[in-house]
Regions:
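Metal-dependent nucleic-acid phosphoesterase active-site entry motif
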Residues: 1-20
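PIN/NYN-family metal-dependent endoribonuclease catalytic core
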Residues: 6-7, 25-54, 65, 70-73
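Terminal helix-to-tail segments of small alpha-helical proteins
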Residues: 9, 18, 59-67, 124
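Residues that scaffold the ATP/ADP-binding catalytic core of kinase and kinase-like folds
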Residues: 14-16, 50, 122
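Active-site neighborhoods of divalent-metal-dependent phosphate/nucleic-acid chemistry enzymes
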Residues: 71-112, 117
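Short helix-capping/linker segments at secondary-structure and domain boundaries
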Residues: 16-22, 53-57, 105-113
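Acidic, PIN/NYN-like endoribonuclease modules and their adjacent C-terminal/linker elements
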Residues: 2-4, 107-136
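A generic structural signal for short hydrophobic patches within well-formed alpha-helices
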Residues: 12, 44, 119-120
Length: 136
C-alpha cells in the first residue's frame, strides 16, 4: 500500500458526482486508499470548477474533515513544475498535473488516484513511471 496517496481533480469529481462515468470506480477505490488524500491547489481549483455549485459543498466538507489535504507549495517547486510543463508541452501538461508529478518526486512511496491517462505518459525524475491507479 502506498505511503502517500495523491488525488487529482478527476478522481475527486468522480468520487463526488454520481453522474460521472467513473463514479463507481472512485467509490470502490476510496476505502482501499484511505484518507487523508494529498493534492495541490491547482487540482482543487479544477475540481471545484468541474463540480460547480452543486458539488462544491461536498468537496468543501472533504477539505474541512481533512480527508483531502493540500501538501504542496507551488512557490517552493516553481522551477521544477515549469520545467515539467515545458517538457510535456505536446501532451499538454496542466499545472495541476505538473504539481502532482512533482509531488511524486518529493513524497515517499506515492501513488496518484486519477481518471486520466496522461500520467502514463509523464515520467518522474525524467525516467521513472508515475505510480497511479486508474479505471482502465
Amino acid at each position: 500500500m502506498a505511503g502517500n496517496v495523491l488525488v487529482d481533480a478527476g478522481f475527486v469529481v468522480a468520487l463526488l458526482s454520481r453522474r460521472d462515468t467513473h463514479h463507481p470506480w472512485a467509490v470502490a477505490q476510496a476505502p482501499q486508499f484511505a484518507p487523508p488524500w494529498n493534492t495541490c491547489e491547482a487540482a482543487l481549483s479544477e475540481a471545484f470548477h468541474l463540480l460547480g455549485t452543486h458539488g462544491a459543498p461536498a468537496l468543501s466538507a472533504l477539505l474541512r474533515r481533512r480527508s483531502v489535504v493540500v501538501v504542496f507549495e507551488l512557490a517552493a517547486d516553481l522551477e521544477s513544475v515549469l520545467m515539467l510543463m515545458r517538457k510535456y508541452v505536446s501532451v499538454p501538461m496542466s499545472l495541476a498535473d505538473a504539481c502532482l508529478v512533482r509531488m511524486t518526486e518529493t513524497l515517499a512511496d506515492p501513488v496518484i488516484l486519477t481518471t486520466g491517462t496522461d500520467f502514463r505518459i509523464y515520467r518522474r525524475h525524467s525516467r521513472h513511471v508515475v505510480p497511479c491507479v486508474t479505471p482502465d
